[in-house]
Amino acid sequence: MFENITAAPADPILGLADLFRADDRPGKINLGIGVYKDETGKTPVLTSVKKAEQYLLENETTKNYLGIDGIPEFARCTQELLFGKGSALINDKRARTAQTPGGTGALRIAADFLAKNTPVKRVWVSNPSWPNHKSVFNAAGLEVREYAYYDAENHSLDFEALQASLSEAQAGDVVLFHGCCHNPTGIDPTLEQWQVLAELSVEKGWLPLFDFAYQGFARGLEEDAEGLRAFAALHKELIVASSYSKNFGLYNERVGACTLVAADAETVDRAFSQMKSAIRANYSNPPAHGASIVATILSNDALRAIWEQELTDMRQRIQRMRQLFVNTLQEKGANRDFSFIIKQNGMFSFSGLTKDQVLRLREEFGVYAVASGRVNVAGMTPDNMAPLCEAIVAVL
């Protein structure tokens, strides 16, 4: 039965990590997978996380199963982070949150819930987007369409083309937006543009689905939620898939959340019962450790202050690396202007490198980037910057 199965293609991002591990060149550089690295090239455990883990170690009394939707305090903290303390939407009990195995788990639960319980048939994602978006929605039986996003010539958001391509989206279609730090371009709408999109979305009858994996990495926790909150102020219904992998450094704990918003408390409770049903048929209930860390930090003022400072430090380090990257490319004689990289948000930069140039970087210089030309700025350090930029200049 199994002998006739053909091999699946390697994942474009995780497959790259396997190639990197197998490379024995000492000066190799990994700018592929989206994890934060510090100045020494390590992915650290945050101090706030260590302190929360110590607290949990001393105070945890059971390893019993969680409920289907996870830890209630985690859900409460998640909603406050997304919609703001004292949000009317929270006070009116219009939101319900399920703790999920990572942001990917949240997206898949949202997809399964929509496919089974609503007339939704189509999901619109930006071109380009995170490659796994298409796989997740297709796996749930939903059609994926693309809307224009990136102006490659000017390295900017092509807002006119975005609006024009979304004019084909029909009432009842899902439109997926990146909450901030658009992956892979690093280019986000302005608040005014978010406002236009929120109004257009209501007018056209789309269901907004926010993929929110990088809150705190663009400008700050509150600022990065402005786009989502513009939608939440106007929409009766929306879904948010959020992740704590990046902003808490909890990559291997798989901590995510799927938040459902409806017109009133009674409707959201009824709809959420079906979301829980989708979870039960998938993984039954989520693991406790990572979400316990997040809930512990967010509900403790002292730990939260440490975490917010650590998040600020991570964000500022990435911004410094963007500046250093652009300066060093110039110093090494790059024959084109890379200053647009400074304006991008979050971990990633859409470098403008071609597939062939990316391949040459890997084969000749041991520099690993995604074929699309996306590079992880958080993988850059003052030590690897010169060899990295020399390699890029050599392949331009």
UniProtKB/Swiss-Prot annotation:
GO biological process annotation, one example: L-phenylalanine biosynthetic process from chorismate via phenylpyruvate
Top enzyme class: transferase
Keyword Ubl conjugation: no
UniProt xrefs under Pfam families: Aminotran_1_2
Keywords, alphabetical: Aminotransferase, Cytoplasm, Pyridoxal phosphate, Transferase
This protein's record includes keyword Cytoplasm: yes
Needed cofactors: pyridoxal 5'-phosphate
Broad class of the protein's primary localization: cytoplasm
The EC number(s) this enzyme carries: 2.6.1.1
Compartment list: Cytoplasm
Protein origin, superkingdom: Bacteria
UniProt-annotated binding residues for L-aspartate: 34, 130, 183, 374
Reactions listed under catalytic activity: L-aspartate + 2-oxoglutarate = oxaloacetate + L-glutamate
Subunit record text: Homodimer.
Family membership noted in the UniProt record: Belongs to the class-I pyridoxal-phosphate-dependent aminotransferase family.
Name listed for the protein in its UniProt record: Aspartate aminotransferase
Organism of derivation: Salmonella typhi
Highest classification ranks of the organism: Bacteria, Pseudomonadati, Pseudomonadota, Gammaproteobacteria, Enterobacterales
